[in-house]
Amino acid sequence: MAALGHLAGEAAAAPGPGTPCASRGARLPGPVSSARNPSTVCLCPEQPTCSNADSRAHPLGDEGGTASKKQKNKKKTRNRASVANGGEKASEKLAPEEVPLSAEAQAQQLAQELAWCVEQLELGLKRQKPTPKQKEQAIGAIRTLRSKRTPLPRKRQLMHSLFGDYRAQMEAEWREALRALRAAAYSAQVQPVDGATRKKSQRVCRPRSIWRAKATLDMPDEEFRFNFF
């Protein structure tokens, strides 16, 4: 009986599959409840409350995320700025630099412009019927443009007042003359003719025997001599 009671006591002390262990049940209920519900407060006086720890942990994570995002955005903006600067530099390198004209080229261009303006004034006097006042003004303008004492700004001002944008007019006239020359050169070239056109325009000229007989009859056998008497 004592053995049976001892065995029964051991069986009662041994944990079953559905009953929790005694060592597990020795834990305090406070931390477990706080772990399950983070809004509850721990009973330990030395440790901070769970709600405070959670509230401290989350802002740090948010601040770190925002800081990393800001750094990434800064890097992206720097890369875009460097790419844009590189593209601008490349476009500047590819753009052709305008070479200023030399003194000789400028003098030659000015002489051509003056000659064109003088020629236009002379043609206007010849082809049109100007009034005496217009004729006097045109002659005065020709003298001013041909004079070496007249300063260059005065000549340019006079040409601009008479013809407006004279450089554009000169360029248009030059293009028209070049087009006419090209058309004349193209028309002067000998172009090969196709076989069909040759067959259509082909003609055969054969002399007739009647004309030969008449020519032989009209020619005398005697030698021709001048008869002055």
Swiss-Prot record:
The keyword Acetylation applies. The keyword Acetylation applies. The modification Omega-N-methylarginine is found at R27. The modification N-acetylalanine is found at A2. Residues 1-96 are annotated as: Disordered. It comes from the Eukaryota. The modification Phosphoserine is found at S82. Residues 1-16 have a biased composition (Low complexity). InterPro entries: DUF4615 (IPR029274). Residues 69-79 have a biased composition (Basic residues). Keywords: Acetylation, Methylation, Phosphoprotein. Pfam families: DUF4615 (PF15393). Belongs to the UPF0488 family. This is UPF0488 protein C8orf33. It comes from Homo sapiens (Human).
